Structure formats: C-alpha cells, structure tokens
Amino acid sequence: MFRWGIIFLVIALIAAALGFGGLAGTAAGAAKIVFVVGIILFLVSLFMGRKRP
C-alpha cells in the first residue's frame, strides 16, 4: 500500500515539474487516499492481531 502511495507521489512531483497541473493534482490526491487507506489497514491489523485466544 505504501509503495503505491510513494509511486503516485513521485508521479505527481514529476508531473508538477513538467507543468501538468491537473495530472499532478490528480496523482497527489490518489497518493493521499492510498496512504490514508494504508495507515487505516495497518492500524486495524495492529489491533486485531493483539487479541488473546
């Protein structure tokens, strides 16, 4: 998940450097969404893994 977030962030940075504002905004938005979903899934797995049998 974090790998995809970093990939979208790099795409956004490259697109912004080349002047593609719309594409950079879209890729940055996708990176934020993927990053937040990754953090939420990490926290859920962290707390679900601590259950005692």
UniProtKB/Swiss-Prot annotation:
Q: Which Pfam families match?
A: DUF1328 (PF07043)
Give the chief site where it resides: membrane
Q: Where in the cell is it found?
A: Cell membrane
- Domain of life the protein comes from: Bacteria
Listed GO CC annotations: plasma membrane
Q: Which NCBIfam families match?
A: PRK13682.1-4, PRK13682.1-5
Query: Sorted alphabetically, which keywords does the UniProt record give?
Result: Cell membrane, Membrane, Transmembrane, Transmembrane helix
The species this protein was found in: Escherichia coli O139:H28 (strain E24377A / ETEC)
Q: What is this protein called?
A: UPF0391 membrane protein YtjA
Q: How does the entry describe its membrane topology?
A: Multi-pass membrane protein
Which protein family is it in?
Belongs to the UPF0391 family.
The record, for InterPro entries, names:
DUF1328
Transmembrane ranges, per UniProt, are 4-24, 30-48
